Regions:
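Conserved catalytic core of the tyrosine transesterase superfamily
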Residues: 1-294
Length: 294
């Protein structure tokens, strides 16, 4: 257990991983350590047979391939750290390949659904102004909800319509917004923001007490707008992020630009959206082409 704790400290202090990422590593490693304990094995004395047994154990529990790949990545990183620290001479997991991942196509909103949500946005009350700004910002920028709640007013460049956001691993990037978002931002800052800002907060999106709005409350605001639009769908802030990426690619944006705007580490992560656009192309073709209909 002490080696796991040392590794997690390394991820936090040296690698600068977020608390959420470190918690994911913790869960994977504790689960693995419990498996070893149940089989009377020491985490420092593992051979190829045990690694295969663990892989078999994960499959038998019905865990999907993507989750298994993540768990193996966590464990592989742990053993590579032990090799780096000269606690072990080699990693028992380097010879274990990740299972081929299942293709996961993220859910996104179509134009009709998106327009319905925007059509019920209003500025009738301070809460309405805030809700409108939240939807506008999420769709205009493609940012994560964790990035949205941490935007500070000073991070916004209203002249250039850009925002500095703090992404995963505390990495900064610049995202852009449009005229619709600019209008919603002006209305909010000139009215609702002053009503909510009872504690002289530096954050943009505030609750009624003047504190930073929570991720959970933003999800509630989105749910309320979806119900108001009479849509029988369940969406999250991440659905809007997926919609941003899909729409950008469908309208001709290149993959590298979308990658930078989303704050992805790898182009492979962004490329999942090309599968979505290809599926849409196929669907449109089959619906529209005379011979495809028959």
């Amino acid at each position: 257990m002490k080696y796991i704790e040392k590794y997690l400290d390394y991820l936090k202090v040296v690698k600068k991983y977020s608390n959420k990422t470190i918690l994911s590593y913790y869960d994977d490693l504790i689960e693995y350590n419990e498996f070893l304990g149940n089989n009377f094995k020491n985490i420092l004395n593992i051979d190829i047979d045990i690694t295969k047994e663990y892989l078999k154990y994960l499959y038998e529990r019905g865990i999907n391939k993507n989750s298994i790949s993540r768990k193996l990545s966590s464990i592989r990183g742990f053993y590579n750290y032990l090799v780096k620290e000269e606690i072990l001479t080699s990693s028992p997991f380097n010879s274990i390949p990740n299972p081929k991942k299942d293709l996961y196509l993220p859910k996104f909103l179509n134009d009709k659904e998106l327009n319905k949500i925007f059509s019920v946005c209003s500025e009738n009350t301070p809460s309405d102004e805030r809700g409108t700004l939240i939807i506008e910002l999420l769709y205009a920028t493609g940012i994560r909800v964790s990035e949205l709640v941490n935007i500070k007013v000073k991070d916004i460049d209203r002249t250039n319509k850009s925002i500095k956001v703090l992404g995963k691993g505390d990495k900064e990037r610049i995202v852009l917004y449009n005229n619709h978002t600019s209008r919603a931002l002006d209305i909010y800052l000139n009215d609702a923001y002053h009503i909510f800002n009872k504690k002289n907060s530096e954050y943009l999106i505030l609750n009624h007490n003047g504190g930073k709005l929570s991720d959970r409350y933003i999800r509630m605001i989105i749910d309320k707008l979806v119900r108001k639009a009479n849509l029988d769908i369940k969406i999250s802030p991440h659905t809007i992020r997926h919609t941003f990426a899909t729409d950008m690619l469908e309208e001709g944006a290149d993959l590298m630009t979308v990658k930078e705007l989303l704050g992805h580490e790898s182009l492979n992560t962004t490329s999942i959206y090309t599968h979505i656009t290809n599926e849409q192309i196929k669907k449109t073709y089959n619906m529209a082409h005379p011979r495809a209909k028959k």
